[in-house]
Amino acid sequence: MTGPARPDAAGAGPSGPVPAGTGPAGGTARLDALLSARGQELLARVAAGREAGQSALALASALRKEYPADLVAAATAQDELRRAAAAKFSRAGRMLFTRPGLEQASSEAAARHRAGRLRAGTAGRLADLGCGIGGDLIALAPGRAVLAVDRDPVHLRMAAYNAGIYDGAAGVRTMAADVRDISLAGVDAVFTDPARRLPAARGPGRRLRPGTSEPPLDWCFALTRQVPAVVVKAAPGLPAGTVPDGWETEFVADGRDLKEAVLWSPALATAPSRATILPGEHVLLPADGDEVPVAAPGPFLFDPNPAVTRAGLVEDLARQLGAWKIDPRIAFLSASTAQHTPFARTLRVVESAPWNEKDFARRLRALGIGAADLRRRGLAGDVDQIHRRLRLAGPHRATLVLTRVSEKPWGLICTDPELP
């Protein structure tokens, strides 16, 4: 088994102070201290204390009697990041993170899915450009030669270390550089995850502008001039028309949570678009077929996964389910029978009628509905305000769908059917 790549210590000794600077030098010194024997001992004690139920504040206060205060602060912060990372990584308790690096990193499931496609479609040496803390490197590196590049020296060292946690350090070579300045000679495939969490990428209200990244996506697409096999991870809100002809856009969801768009160059593309649902790697691809009919809602309603909707595959899903659309421009589907599918939530229709808030409020109360999940699509209105005005009461739960049917405002009261 290959252990984690252990960077050489290059700062203060394990018993000395840990520099508190926020620049590369300070971050590297803190990393050195955490990777020292005493730092590893402290990380283990922090984890054990938290597992035993001690608060972070009380634990840090006790540990400062034995360790430098800066080292305790670094260790407790790292432990918090490891706890947060447990939702993404199965070995998070042994990995190293920064908060920005963790926020941008793919989940382990998404990284493994992507690495599997790359492994099936390419051979030879791979470049991971902008590797961050190694969220994808952990899946790309095992059994393959990988050049990991990042201009942040702390992230680069963490990436190599984390690859070792997943037994992939042997084939990893790291390079501290701006990805735009390196040569790709000898590289057979490229994966890049350009940074999207930039101050300039945020508009009013600090919302991320879709498609804004560093390096820009146009630079990422141009990599095919050097290496034909290129994979780009992007935000799922990618504007229409951003991706060049011949590329595949894959929308990846974790359950019903849309996580990312993955762009596959023409050398790797298998379809114009696809929807992938994790866990389980359920894949929906476009297929030729008859036009999907439009009709009134039937006994069952299907609410497609956001990955299906973003990939433009709602009609493909309808054909797969033998379903119809309830409106030409709305992404709800309906059918006469319940079906279990990973690509949509299935709902049993209890009530279907033109939308009138007062009438539906009375009907919901008559059904004993005390809690309702409101799903609005194609109708204006503040969901929270509507929910308050309904004044629900009762022991049962339902889904209230507010939408359009044949261009008319429509409401549906639905429940989850019992499916095998």
Where are these regions (language model features)?
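SAM-dependent transferase fold signal centered on methyltransferase-like domains
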Residues: 1-420
